[in-house]
Amino acid sequence: MIMLYWRYSKNQCETKSEENMLENFIKEADMPQEVIEKYEKQVPAELVQIWQEDGLGTFLDGYLKVINPDDYLELLQDSYFRGGVAFPMFVTAFGDIITWEENAYVGIVQYNIQDLDIMIKRMDRFIEYVDDEDFKDDYFDIPLYKKAVAKHGELAYDECFGFVPLLALGGSKDVEHMDKVKVLEHICLMYQLAGGVFDD
């Protein structure tokens, strides 16, 4: 399902700053300068600023991670039918990749259910709405994440929660059937065993 997110508010002309979006940011490491220089003309200025000022780490109470795109770009291109026009920006606590697409849209590639959504147009709008309750309800599974953390503990930077067995292979979407796994390896596993996200 493709859905563009928009809601009127009397403050809609005001943009939330990157600092507000990442106010609970936990830094893991600096983004390598060579990565910034390699991609700075291909991605939104807001993302470059995040790379420069915050680096690699987690935000939204650990649900989202700022990633090194070099770690995910080839996998995204191989496993996603829009991979040629998509750029990996973040990953979620359940192994979804949040993308910048066609130099215009923020999308989410959901390997667990082999689906995608175009979340919103413009990076500044994503920044404005990412902590909005309705936006999170539409695109993230915060309640399940909180239950998973309560049962299995907080995730390390390189981890996500993986369903065992995979949802695409008949697994159950609950905390009793998940474990902590390495994010990149788990996305590769979902792609290899269940297939990627393709336009079929």
Identify the role of each PLM range.
Residues 68-72, 110, 127, 144-147:
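Short, surface-exposed, charged/polar-biased interaction segments
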Residues 2-108, 161-200:
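A surface-exposed partner-binding patch
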